Swiss-Prot record:
UniProt keyword Cytoplasm, yes or no: yes
Catalytic activity: tRNA(Phe) + L-phenylalanine + ATP = L-phenylalanyl-tRNA(Phe) + AMP + diphosphate + H(+)
Coiled coil: none
GO biological process: phenylalanyl-tRNA aminoacylation
Cystine connections: none
Gene Ontology cellular component list: cytoplasm
Amino acids binding Mg(2+): 255
Keyword annotations of the record: Aminoacyl-tRNA synthetase, ATP-binding, Cytoplasm, Ligase, Magnesium, Metal-binding, Nucleotide-binding, Protein biosynthesis
Protein's organism: Phocaeicola vulgatus (strain ATCC 8482 / DSM 1447 / JCM 5826 / CCUG 4940 / NBRC 14291 / NCTC 11154) (Bacteroides vulgatus)
The protein's name in its UniProt record: Phenylalanine--tRNA ligase alpha subunit
Localisation: Cytoplasm
Name of the coding gene: pheS
């Protein structure tokens, strides 16, 4: 038996397999219940007593070496398979950098989360809109400057004609108009999205940017309700110590209208170059929905009232992360975008 064991030891040391099928055949040959090693184990009971210790040690050595060799070959195959699967011959020779969320997406999601906790749902609408939903339904006069081609992008029907009633939306208020058109109060929505203006691109203006507008319509909605929402939003977005102030303003779709400032988050309201020494920074416009807007969209203004507010996401991002050039948000400069990895 010792001679047979030595023969198997030599065989096992030289085991090779070209593929997984050959490896499985070797395992069956040596380690299965009917394999060569188990046959020797069965014959062990016939070994003379004086040889049992020596033969037993050799049998254990044989079994251990067979298991180790089979395991080694299996590991080599798995490593080889993984290497082949991971190899991508089209991959660039330069390191691949993992992407992160864009700073505008980070801030947009923060805004959505705040209003979601206040019971607002998200509404969406087309970026290519008609005059009705962008201007008429929002109480813009026929001669309002926003209707002029110097301020708005109009869609060309063909080379000879420009369709005056189809535009790239200038604000997400068009989503509010569609919501009022197809829903009955109570309405409580926010409208995040991209908008377009015919502007010269500079550090403080761009031809496209992003807005979030909010609309709440129900019975007995008051300006006090609006103010409470604004204060909560400011504290959630910029910190618990943030103060707000409201200044009278004008918007075609709200009456009364106001612009909201927050205490400067850089100097704490003490005055600095960023806030031009005033201690305050403007962040959004708001007001009570004009009765004409309600009526134009099929809502009885004698029964229902509401408030609306709108802010530029770029503006909020500028204030939150102190970015002073709007163009950075659309240039895809990875050096700039990587600065926001911690916020992801």
């Amino acid at each position: 038996m010792l001679a047979k064991i030595e023969q198997l030891l030599q065989e096992i040391e030289g085991l090779q397999a070209a593929n997984a099928e050959e490896l499985e055949a070797l395992r069956i040959k040596y380690l299965s219940k009917k394999g060569a090693i188990n046959e020797l184990m069965a014959d062990f009971r016939n070994v003379p007593a004086e040889q049992k210790k020596e033969v037993g040690m050799k049998l254990n050595e044989l079994k251990n070496k067979a298991q180790e060799r089979i395991a080694s070959l299996k590991e080599a195959f798995e490593t080889q398979d993984n290497s082949a699967a991971e190899m991508d011959l089209t991959r660039t020779a330069y390191p691949i950098e993992l992407g992160t969320r864009h700073p505008l997406s980070i801030v947009k999601n923060e805004i959505i989360d705040i209003f979601h906790r206040l019971g607002f749902s998200i509404a969406d609408g087309p970026e290519i809109e008609d005059d009705l939903h962008v201007f008429t339904a929002m109480n813009f006069a026929e001669d309002h400057p926003a209707r002029d081609m110097q301020d708005t992008f109009f869609i060309e029907a063909n080379q000879e004609d420009v369709k005056k009633n189809i535009v790239l939306r200038t604000h997400t208020s068009s989503v509010q108009a569609r919501a009022m058109e197809h829903s009955q109060p109570p309405i409580r929505i926010i409208c995040p999205g991209r908008v377009y203006r015919n502007e010269a691109i500079s550090y403080r203006a761009h031809a496209f940017f992003h807005q979030v507008e909010a609309l709440y319509i129900d019975k007995n909605v008051s300006f006090t309700d609006l103010k409470q929402v604004l204060l909560l939003f400011a504290k959630e977005m910029f910190g618990e110590d943030t103060q707000i102030r409201l200044r009278p303003s004008y918007f075609p779709f709200t009456e009364p209208s106001a612009e909201m400032d927050i205490s400067c988050n850089i100097c704490g309201g003490k005055g600095c170059p960023f806030c031009k020494g005033t201690g305050w920074v403007e962040i959004l416009g708001c007001g009570m929905v004009d009765p004409n807007v309600l009526e134009a969209n099929g809502i009885d203004s004698k029964v229902y009232s509401g408030y609306a507010l709108g802010m530029g996401i770029e503006r909020i991002t500028n204030l939150k992360y102190r970015v002073n050039d709007l163009r950075l948000f659309s240039e895809n400069d990875t050096r700039f975008l990587k600065e926001f990895e911690a916020a992801n």
